[in-house]
Amino acid sequence: MSTATYHDRAAKHASPLASKLLELMHEKQTNLCASLDVDTTTELLRLVDILGPYICLVKTHVDILSDFSMDGTVKPLKELAAKHKFLIFEDRKFADIGNTVKLQYSSGVYQISQWADITNAHGVTGPGIVQGLKQAAEETTQEPRGLLMLAELSSKGSLAHGEYTKGTVEIAKTDKDFVIGFIAQRDMGGRDEGYDWLIMTPGVGLEDKSDALGQQYRTVEDVISTGSDIIIVGRGLFGKGRDPKIEGDRYRKAGWEAYLKRCNP
């Protein structure tokens, strides 16, 4: 587990995208990613504008949106990202052969590689998935892009553990500048081999412990103390009548305090 500051890690990181994100986190004093699973662009943009000051990342599932368009959704989302200084993570969870994911990432309705700073993928199809996604990024944009591998999940009964997780880590080692880290519940090592992977952890809640569909929640301090760099929070920010402004500030403070404690044990 890294006890170095985000600022120090940014200065040495092999990935331009990871370096940009770490420096942004340092400057804004936040390690909060807002996961916004809503079904209209209006609601997405409303929540993003409220939560923007408190977050380093917004995590989207644009295939949920009933009214997605490049001009109506992506353009204003990128404007809000510039206004509030956060990056965009499209939680696509690619899981196919290299050539197919290359097309899924760059083409179709969503053209993800053109606007999402970060996306993610399962390791189940092998290292070709990394190569395909990287080629798509290089062919469609001059902007830096980053990929997270799904090493562990927060849902009850997940099969992503043990040998599967180890295999996913080995796939991540095939590309040092494009693969920036993992979706995981704990530190994934790698520092002794020269990797500085970012760990982003879903299923974080200050109050909730679980939901009816198998999601299991851990506390902010618990996930940061076991190696997470970024906490991913969804319904804890805006569900059940919660005020996103108040909750955004609460989670930002909790995440930052836990990070400072890890850096200064």
Swiss-Prot record:
Gene3D superfamilies: Aldolase class I (3.20.20.70). InterPro entries: Aldolase_TIM (IPR013785), OMPdecase (IPR014732), OMPdecase_AS (IPR018089), OMPdeCOase_dom (IPR001754), RibuloseP-bd_barrel (IPR011060). Transmembrane segments: none annotated. One of its GO terms (biological process) is 'de novo' UMP biosynthetic process. Keywords: Decarboxylase, Lyase, Pyrimidine biosynthesis. One of its GO terms (molecular function) is orotidine-5'-phosphate decarboxylase activity. The active site is at 93 (proton donor). The keyword Manganese does not apply. Pathway: Pyrimidine metabolism; UMP biosynthesis via de novo pathway; UMP from orotate: step 2/2. The keyword Lyase applies. It catalyses: orotidine 5'-phosphate + H(+) = UMP + CO2. Its EC number is 4.1.1.23. One of its GO terms (cellular component) is cytosol. Substrate binds at residues 37, 59-61, 91-100, 217, 235. Belongs to the OMP decarboxylase family. This is Orotidine 5'-phosphate decarboxylase.
